[in-house]
Amino acid sequence: MIYTSNEICQMFLNFFYKKGHTILPGSTLIPNNDPSLLFTNSGMNQFKDIFIQKNYNFKYNRVTTLQNCLRTGGKHNDFENVGYTPQHHTFFQMLGNFSFRDYFKLDAILYAWKFLTSKEQLNLSKEKLWITVYQDDLESYNIWKNIIKIDKHKIIKIGNKYNSSDSDNFWQMGEIGPCGPCTEIFYDYGNTLPGTIPGNNGCNVPRFVEIWNIVFIQFNKLSNGKLIKLTESYVDTGMGLERISAVINNVTSNYEIDLFKPLIKHILELSTVNTPKNKSIYVIADHIRACSFIISENIIPSNEKHGYVLRRIIRRAIRHGHNLGIKSLFLHKLIPTLINTMGKFNPVLKKQQNKIENVLKLEEQKFIETLEKGLKLLHKELKQIQPKHVLSGKLAFNLYDTFGFPIDLTIDICKEHNISINIMEFKRYLNQHKQNSINKNFLNTRNAYYIEDNNINIKTHFVGYQFNKTQSIINNIIIKNNKKTLQINDYQNSILFLNETPFYGESGGQIGDSGIIHNKTGKFIVNCTKMFGNIIGHVGTLASGYLNIHDTVCAEINLPKRKSIQINHTATHLLHASLRKILGKHVFQKGSFISDQSLKFDFSHNAPMNLREIQEVENIINKKIQKNISVSTTLTTLQEIQNKKVMALFQDKYKDKVRMISINDFSVELCGGTHTKYTGDIGLFKITSEISISSGIRRIEAVTGKHAISIIHHQEKTINNIANMLNSKTNNIEQTITKLLNNNIHLKKQIYTLYNQNIYNIVNSLSKHNILIKDVNIIIKNLKNENLLSLRNIVDKLKNRFKCSVIIISSIINNKSIIIVGVTRNVTDRISALDILNKLTKKLGGRGGGKNNIAEGGIKNLISLPIELKKIKTWISSRL
């Protein structure tokens, strides 16, 4: 019997529900607490902590799920195979059943066999199924042979790979840790298709297709390779929905099942090709699923991490659309079809439909502008390279940097021409580019001072969270050229290192404190405070007296400046949370610069913010300010916050103990900076600009408190000045300006009419000076005060009026002469406009340029111009 994919999914979940399993939702496509993974790539990911015995509080012993998965890189990289094989996908759905310290091998195998072969379930022919087991797993082998009664020639023992401890039938989470043998079930499509039996060179498709993998986690692997049996065992199984659906429907390609057919039909309608069996159609059908599910989890295209994977997938799909003759934006048009196909088990697609379509449109618009040029350059280069030769990494990088070609897209195109790429050279150029970008980015500027680690060996204890000034001891003094000194007694720049300090060292986007370090003998002005590794350096100048190493001093920050910095830092946290509320959860901090004057905040977003969005963000922040909410600080551990909604820049390195800054539950972030005690201290928040700084990254600049009031006062002053200039009241400025603009449009129309009338009159007047020589009309005239645009217009109209003509018109304006020569195309075989102009400029001085039918230039000798214009008439006559 034939079933739809949705029916198979429901049958699977119901079957295991009746076997005592709890049906749980699949985890998000972006793993919540696993930094080792960009995307969820299997059903077991959400249960990883249970398998590695970190989570003992899980209340279920038996679970079944449908899990959305994505594989585009690393160990499980299906990206390059998508479209070229019938079974590989970037996005796919995995059915799974799991046992946590409950049933083991016998029940797991019996359940799988019953679901696949019983008449009440999928009713697959037992004769079509083949089995692989790990060579040392005799228990599984005997279950298949003696209990399930599989012919032993259909049970293949798989050993370790050559010269390795790895095996396709022995699952390992890593080099050490939980592991165990697995048994796989294969479906045999029959000997009409090519392919060897499972285990022979990896089981070539398409004859034998793996449909179910059952993993038995029963060992712990030590660093020396020894396997220790676990006291409790686990079962982790996975069956690809797309593959089993193809088997049930007796088709050899996943692209022929109901999950793909509507998409392929729609793509075919948009394309110029005639057959659905096309690699480019398969690529697009796969990629539109992957793109949509990634975007639905609030990821947008960018140049890093999840966003870059999304960009790669979208741009590969666009290129394959180009292969199909699709020249306009098309990906967003496929979304309604996708929702109709997959929306039942994935309601998030319908919920996020508008966002998915808009993100796809924007990314297509960006890439389609450069795709054609990049392809032209690449194909030109490929024509010069012999098959099996290598494309330079430099060109591949140029395509990446200039035309936005992800490297795998270039690899894909080269693969079609049997050409490889110098990847090492590409990576070298890419790494250099990244380094240059870091050096140029003001949010990541390096310290202006370089201190060798061995120069300073005593760390500074920071007390600035609690105190504004403290008694301290000078540990080290560094002067120019990285030299230590025992005393400073002149006014040169120096760096003081104290054993304890209230000065915050520049980090996390927050500028360092300034202030004074002093005692009875001397006073040191701290201009800025820098971090040198874990050591705080006070950079400044001696103002008076002298200071010695080991002196006891008073270190005192500039408190008003610190308070202004704190206000802006807390405002930055409010801004971050507000942006995520208004724009979406895809917004993440990409950098910041927080000073006492203003704040700059870089964030991920792929479109300019409109005025409404900016004002909504301002309103949210100012309401939080008005509520005067307490800003609390908590010392905690990374482990303790893993299950909390805490924002953190995970590219940053955090210590075991971290500071959590909370503004109620509105904003909770890990942060080492200094903050105000109450939101009310901020006073007022005002955004001054919102710009793009790179693809997918926006920057907001904002001010707070007195600086925000100053901005508003400046805007009021500007409005008043404009009102005075317009002789209008401030509340009528818009109407007054609209009236002026309308009047301006009306006057422009009048001027244009008068201009055209003037040109018409000049053309009529010049037509009377026409001289016919042989069959050619010649008009030569010097005008006054007509600009170059007018002369061009006059010459064009005269050439249209006199279909066989030579026109020479000059004009003196502001004591400069301009000249245009026009020759109708039916005369250019006898005389050239450029030749006429060159003869005049040679006699009169000046220069110009043009073509045979039109030329223009400037003349220096204005006095002789009338004489030479008369002479040129004779010369033209001689040439006709």
From Swiss-Prot:
GO terms for cellular component: cytosol. GO terms for molecular function: alanine-tRNA ligase activity; aminoacyl-tRNA deacylase activity; ATP binding; tRNA binding; zinc ion binding. Its cofactor is Zn(2+). SMART domains: tRNA_SAD (SM00863). It catalyses: tRNA(Ala) + L-alanine + ATP = L-alanyl-tRNA(Ala) + AMP + diphosphate. It is found in: Cytoplasm. Its main location: cytoplasm. Keywords: Aminoacyl-tRNA synthetase, ATP-binding, Cytoplasm, Ligase, Metal-binding, Nucleotide-binding, Protein biosynthesis, RNA-binding, tRNA-binding, Zinc. Its EC number is 6.1.1.7. It is an enzyme of class 6 (ligase). The keyword Signal does not apply. The keyword Zinc-finger does not apply. Binds 1 zinc ion per subunit. CDD domains: AlaRS_core. GO terms for biological process: alanyl-tRNA aminoacylation; negative regulation of DNA-templated transcription. It comes from the Bacteria. Zn(2+) binds at H569, H573, C671, H675. Pfam families: DHHA1, tRNA-synt_2c, tRNA_SAD. Gene3D superfamilies: 2.40.30.130, 3.10.310.40, 3.30.54.20, Bira Bifunctional Protein, Domain 2, Threonyl-trna Synthetase, Chain A, domain 2. Belongs to the class-II aminoacyl-tRNA synthetase family. NCBIfam families: alaS. Consists of three domains; the N-terminal catalytic domain, the editing domain and the C-terminal C-Ala domain. The editing domain removes incorrectly charged amino acids, while the C-Ala domain, along with tRNA(Ala), serves as a bridge to cooperatively bring together the editing and aminoacylation centers thus stimulating deacylation of misacylated tRNAs. Homotetramer. Catalyzes the attachment of alanine to tRNA(Ala) in a two-step reaction: alanine is first activated by ATP to form Ala-AMP and then transferred to the acceptor end of tRNA(Ala). Also edits incorrectly charged Ser-tRNA(Ala) and Gly-tRNA(Ala) via its editing domain. This is Alanine--tRNA ligase. The lineage of its organism: Bacteria, Pseudomonadati, Pseudomonadota, Gammaproteobacteria, Enterobacterales.
